[in-house]
A protein has these predicted regions:
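Active-site metal-coordination segments of metallo-dependent hydrolases
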Residues: 35-41, 138-146
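Short amphipathic alpha-helical face segments that pack within enzyme cores
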Residues: 44, 147-155
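Catalytic cores of nuclease domains that cleave nucleic-acid phosphodiester backbones
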Residues: 48-138, 147, 161-169, 173-176
Length: 236
């Protein structure tokens, strides 16, 4: 059994940052966490959005009514061969940021799940990446949101050298809102690529080098499946 984390994703990085021990128990020891209704609902909504865009679902479920306009637009774009759209895809890279496939177990270093990405209509070559969120938008998590957008941008710029820029965004389906807000996008160009690569290499370095996985008590411990009071292996 491996004693270190050898590959990563944004969600794996987020869990490690919350608590190294939780990351070990979940990703190395493979101690499975039970599902919950919020996760099941999120999966259902993501699947419904995918099916609607692809034309496999004719009617939107009520949970997606607040983002109906963007979904109808994406559905129309999906029909066009030139749209350059991907829906529910996984982008994967090696340690040198070379493109690979998600199931390259020997060399894949990072996996990035993409809900939908499409090219904007017009002369400029712009890729819009949209991540569906079923939870609530929280202002205090802005730093985390920016990190996620940076990773999307890094991957897109690496994959598509012809792009003028990338505009990643989060879409909160329950609230019908986008972050960043409409008209105020965060843009990334190819000049940002080497900076983003170094930034993410630095961010994940401690996670990939960790061999002790010290627990990190915090406010989320009360919800953790591995907590002591739940009969878990954690001391807290």
């Amino acid at each position: 059994m491996p004693k270190q984390i050898t590959s990563w994703s944004f969600s794996r990085y987020a869990v490690y940052r919350e608590c190294p021990l939780k990351a070990k128990l979940k990703f190395i020891d493979k101690l499975e966490e039970p599902g919950n209704e919020a996760m099941a609902r999120g999966n259902r909504i993501h699947k419904a959005a995918e099916q609607f865009i692809k034309g496999e679902l004719k009617t939107l479920p009520p949970e997606l009514n607040k983002v109906a306009s963007i979904l109808r637009y994406l559905k129309g774009r999906y029909k066009k061969i030139t749209s350059g759209m991907v829906v529910e895809d996984t982008w994967a890279f090696t340690k040198t940021w070379t493109k690979t496939v998600w199931n390259d177990w020997a060399a894949c270093w990072v996996r990035i799940k993409v809900d939908v990405a499409h090219r904007r209509e017009g002369k400029e070559k712009v890729l819009i990446i949209t991540d569906w969120k079923t939870g609530k938008f929280r202002e205090e998590k802005n730093d985390e949101y920016v990190e996620q957008l940076e990773l999307y941008a890094l991957a897109a710029l690496q994959l598509y050298p012809d792009l003028d820029y990338v505009e990643p965004q989060l879409c909160y389906t329950d609230q019908g809102m986008f972050w960043p807000k409409d008209g105020d996008p965060i843009r990334f160009t190819h000049q940002d690529l080497p900076v983003l690569q170094k930034l993410w290499e630095k961010r994940v370095k401690s996670m990939l080098n960790d061999t002790t996985f010290t627990p990190k008590p915090n406010n989320n411990c009360r919800y953790c499946h591995y907590r002591k009071s739940n009969g878990g292996p954690c001391q807290y």
